[in-house]
Amino acid sequence: MSVIIDIHAREILDSRGNPTVEVDVTLEDGTMGRAAVPSGASTGAYEAVEKRDGDKARYKGKGVLAAVEAVNGEIADTLVGFDATEQVAIDQTMCELDGTDNKGRLGANAILGVSLATAKAAADFTAQPLYRYVGGTMAHVLPVPMMNIINGGEHADNPIDIQEFMIMPVSATSIAEAVRMGSEVFHTLKSELSAAGLSTGIGDEGGFAPNLSSTRDALDFVLKSIEKAGYAPGDDMVLALDCAATEYYRDGKYELSGEGKSLTSDENVAYLAALVANYPIFSIEDGMGEDDWDGWIALTEALGDKVQLVGDDLFVTNPARLKDGIDRKAANSLLVKVNQIGTLTETLAAVNMATRAGFTSVMSHRSGETEDATIADLAVATNCGQIKTGSLARSDRLAKYNQLIRIEEQLEETANFAGRSILRG
């Protein structure tokens, strides 16, 4: 009865108005799982390949009809008849069918859509929520959210080089309380920016994108808003940054053009260390460029005992890249993006490898999202304790927060909000 009888993909639009792939997997008993695939703006060079049509006359080349056809053709022809509960076999079969190291022939967006839709169908078939189906009976930890309230870099049209300024409500006792705290700071920040005559337009991930002059200017606005909302920076809320440094790492230098700085790797480490010394920063993502391994090692030596150093472009959720980082002692945390590697099985393998090495994991959205809230379930399934899914605006971001609230309600007294347990030291 859990045999797959139909796989159907379609082209839909993501939160940026760009095409993406949505897949329905239907089982013999009529159960259907549906998944929509996210897409990134700042992408790592080592990510699995997202297949785009390249026809400039249609969606400016961003169409995904070829990926849709790959699902409706080759992938469906191969997987119809498989048992949906055999997730590992299904994912492995798709990887073998693709035949490349980066899923470039069929497209990671095609393969991932089928992988996630299959898991959802199997979860429904077994009458379990997705987090329970994937994570088993021990899945009960609600993650602390990294809430992106100021956008810069590739996510906004302003001079700030660092891509994301985030708050983490660690003193909350539930995900519902954490969301409330974040919302209150978000709206306070809006009032503060407006009072200063700055734009309150929002970026791709729902954070504000004001025309601020520097990283410290942005951090000062965030701290003031936390305090005015009635919370204590460093106690109730800690800060997280996503530098996305690969985007401004050129010819061996970190070109912070918005601030008129050109830094060597050692100078960039010192720049970040100074921020950590002056602000309650708990986590820094992609503080160094994806190919600057020596810089990553230096950053980890300098800050790794007191700051979570998250590899996104560095690791691209790839177990092979992650193993390299573990061996080199570069970073101490993995950012988990399902579309970087392209299957649920490989995503879970990366999280397991990180955990065994003593790394933390942060489940993450992409800047191009949909109403699909799968990552909320995966955050709970893996007990990773942290999720990065944007601001307190845009329904594509709030879909994930709302799903976490529902999961917390379902878990009742067994729910455990990670809270301060994530803090280092």
Swiss-Prot record:
GO terms for cellular component: cell surface; extracellular region; phosphopyruvate hydratase complex. The active site is at E205 (proton donor), K337 (proton acceptor). GO terms for biological process: glycolytic process. The keyword Cytoplasm applies. It is found in: Cytoplasm; Secreted; Cell surface. The keyword Magnesium applies. Mg(2+) binds at D242, E285, D312. It comes from the Bacteria. InterPro entries: Enolase, Enolase-like_C_sf, Enolase-like_N, Enolase_C, Enolase_CS, Enolase_N. PANTHER family: ENOLASE. Belongs to the enolase family. Catalyzes the reversible conversion of 2-phosphoglycerate (2-PG) into phosphoenolpyruvate (PEP). It is essential for the degradation of carbohydrates via glycolysis. This is Enolase. It comes from Jannaschia sp. (strain CCS1).
